Amino acid sequence: VTLYRLMRQLLHRYDNTRLTTVAMHPRYRNIDTDSLPADLAVATEVNSYNYRYMYFPGDMKRYPEKIFYQSEASTEAMGPNFFEMELDKVMGLAYWGAVDYLGESLGWPLKGWNKGVFDMTMLPKPDAYFVKSMFSEEPLVHIAIIEKAGTDTQWNGINVATQRLSENWNRNQGEQLSLYTYTNVDEVELLLNGRSLGVKKNDADPKQRNRIRWDAVPYEPGTLMAVARKAGKVVARHQLTTTGEAVALKLKPETTDWHADGKDLMMVRVTAVDRKGRRVLSAHDLLHIEVKGE
């Protein structure tokens, strides 16, 4: 507590407009429902708990003057760990790690964290739109094909398993697929080449909200479209389309300001495209990269 107060004093010397906090993984009386706050938790201006958002209701009653924040939240539990919080009294959360990065690999051949909703170049993965549906009032719908179910993967005692998702609509004829439609409005209709596969309502249950699951969706070449409606009016669409075979590679650097000093690092996104310039998500060819220069 003393060190925190000294650091807060230093911070307020430069900026006294902001509240301060410390991320904590709290002790508990009951692991599922009831925390046992340390002295530091009571001393901070904002009570920040890693993962244990289920303790907020009890601690809100004990400390009604406090503001609460989920300082680390698991991407595996996305949805419930946001919607189950009493959002009028909780200022939000931070998903860890929402962006992939080098380091903290879960094993070779990975060189870094790969459980985020954005890759290392900030390209959104399908479930990034699930996060957007929580925080944005702009109507949206987004299709995510479930390629592989998550397995129980522990990292520092937290389950970090995530499903492998894609937007790939190049499949095998007759394949039966499971998918999500992420949305923040009332209902979604799924259409395959113009034929309706049904309409599903957005569930108010925090464990299901904004994430509608569809099973046994038949594949056929063409277009799979999700149409979102609010109060009966179409407010958003998203579609996946079958592409041709990959015939070229498109390279896009993150910036044109690249210094050839042997130290500067540049992210270059390599995309396989078909004859119409569309991204081919089914392309898994091994690439050989050669860099020349002085």
Model features per residue range: what roles?
Residues 2-27, 38-262, 275-276:
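Substrate-binding clefts and catalytic carboxylate motifs of secreted carbohydrate-active enzymes
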Residues 29-31:
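Sequence/structural signature of outer-membrane beta-barrel proteins
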Residues 178, 267, 286:
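Broad gene-expression machinery/nucleic-acid interaction feature
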Residues 268-272, 277:
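Short, well-ordered beta-strand segments enriched in hydrophobic/aromatic residues
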Residues 279-282:
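Short acidic/proline- and small/hydrophobic-mixed sequence motifs that coincide with surface turns
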